Amino acid sequence: MDTQKSITLLNDLIVINNDRVEGYKTAEIETPETDLKILFYDMQATSESNRIELASAVTKLNGEVEEGTRATGKFFRFWMDFKATITGNNRGTILDSCEYGEDKALDEYENVLDEKEHLSIENLQMIQRQKAQIEVDHTKVKKLRDEAMD
């Protein structure tokens, strides 16, 4: 196991969770719909919990915890588009944008899991558990989106 590579992989997931928290904070503020506000708050909480776990793992490896978001790249552009979308208050469009963001988060988890040889068993299990929770969130968003589009 390459410790520096482990730290980098864990920090990649911290950043995607930071992005997710910021995106859903924006969504929660901008949407007028109570059920979506609750959903977005819960998704923020999931990513905040993930971030804390990941940061602890980085610290145990004597690494420096990444605090930022990806100010460049696809995920940031998604959230900027998302903010513009939600100001129109179209439930289906909001949820469609959320699903896209969840896809990007899951892609990042898959990318890290593709390099599992650089992770301890403990960190691998944590990442798999976090990914499973994001998959649950994705399913919720997709279901609500499909209902809104009908």
PLM region spans:
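Acidic (E/D-rich), amphipathic helical modules within compact regulatory domains
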Residues: T34-E64
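Secondary-structure edge/capping motif, primarily at the C-terminal ends of alpha-helices
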Residues: A27-T31, V58-L61, I86, L113-E117, ...
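Preference for long, well-ordered alpha-helical segments
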Residues: I94-D150
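Amphipathic alpha-helical coiled-coil segments
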Residues: N50-V58, T87-G88, V136-A148
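Amphipathic alpha-helices that form helix-helix packing interfaces
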Residues: L13, R20, N50, A57, ...
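Carboxylate-rich helix-loop segments that flank metal/cofactor sites and access channels
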Residues: I52, T59-G88, G92-T93, Y100-L106
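Short, charged, amphipathic alpha-helical segments
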Residues: N11, K37-A45, T69, D96-E99, ...
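Alpha-helical bundle segments that constitute or directly flank the non-heme di-iron/ferroxidase center
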Residues: D2-T31, T93-E117
